[in-house]
Amino acid sequence: MNKKVFSFSLLLVTLFSLLGMTTNASAEENGEFRVGMEAGYAPFNWSQKNDAHGAVPIQGNSYAGGYDVQISKKIADGLGRKLVIVQTKWDGLAPALQSGKIDAIIAGMSPTAERKKEIAFTNPYYESQFVVIVKRDGKYANAKSLKDLADAKITAQLNTFHYGLIDQIPNVNKQQAMDNFSAMRTALASGMIDGYVSERPEGITATSVNKELKMLEFPKENGFDASAEDSQVAVGMRKGDTDIEKVNKILAGISQDERTKIMDQAIKDQPAATDSDEQKTGLINDFKNIWNQYGDMFLRGAGLTLFIALIGTVVGTTLGLLIGVFRTIPDSENPVARFFQKLGNLILSIYIEVFRGTPMMVQAMVIFYGLALAFGISLDRTVAALFIVSVNTGAYMSEIVRGGIFAVDKGQFEAAQAIGMTHGQTMRKVVIPQVLRNILPATGNEFVINIKDTAVLSVIGVADLFFQGNAASGANFQFFQTFTIVGIMYLVMTFVITRILRVVERKMDGPSAYVKVEELTEEGKES
């Protein structure tokens, strides 16, 4: 049993190592220019289901369009490399660049002094002005200066220069920063906030789609005081990258008139703007329109969610069984074997405590970006997701298995020992079959949890169902409707899985678990 446990554990380690090595090799320069962006910040970037308006395929996803994409195409052409769009959450862009997951950030990012400490920036490729988005019929709709926004509940996107600008509003009621613009628009529409700070192109987009919103533009003397670099947008690249000067030359060849035309065209081409004129309005029609436009993306996301959850649960449960069995092995009489046994138990205890005691989102950031930064191990997003969910599930299942083993009557252990069975034989032939049945409900519950927990993996850009929902809501500006659809899809998946597992439980229990309808009828008549 010890040899089998060790061999299987070694096999798992080797498998993930080989996957990591394979992915690392594929991440090296192959004539590609990998650009990171949210693909959810229209009109700078958005996601769509086809290549209309010059959109570019997203790595492992659909298509990306927008101003940033068109600039990226010009840079890639100038460098003589193939453009690859890597959809990444805003918080993950800088770590992705530093760890070598992407070659550049072209996502409407300003070259602030704080960011320049971590990454390098090219010359600006766009310059904007800052505005405040409020409700058209709200208290602050007629504000003419920042002073008129006193006491207003104002927010901005997390980890952006916009959030710092709020402090320039006298007596402002500064709210917690939000993760994305979809969340801010929803908060504004629901009355949770009075307004949010954004750049003018985003303001034009928001107000053109939602007529209930209004964009406040202030004269220079009454508006935000921002330095030139803070109002500019530049390409983020790794420090020491020799391509920075090449990119600067390419950007210099794009005239201001051409940049203006590209932005104007992006505002016209964005899905929310084009669809608003073509589609019927109303809540039911909103749901239909969203499904027609993004249904394929949602289904792909749901498929990836189920795949990660299923593989993670199977591998994690197997890992939990092996660990649980190992930790119940009696102490060896051999001093050397006993030492390694205790060392193994110590290592496993640390593993269990670490993965049970830290959030999966933190684990994802450390494993996906940390391994690349510290050791040069670059994992594919899906491989990283499988690894994270598997080891996380293994940590929880190992304790469940251990409890299941201890729940088996001691008399069975004694009886097996009395007839000459070894510990391994006892486990294999007597204990484990009972444990598997006893832990089936817990295993099914872990599967359901994994389906929902894959949502946190969006922090490393895993294109699961939640990630696809974020991308869609960022493009269509319909946060409530989009995530209602996403929520229903999660509910359907978990409901179906739960019912299937109950059928499996009955099958494992045998015919005694069933009651004939005739018997129930007879009992009803007697009562």
Residue ranges of model-derived segments:
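Ligand-binding clefts/hinges and TM-proximal coupling segments of bilobed small-molecule sensing domains
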Residues: 82, 161-178, 246-285
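A ligand-binding cleft/hinge motif common to bilobed small-molecule-binding domains
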Residues: 92-95, 108-118, 165-168, 182, ...
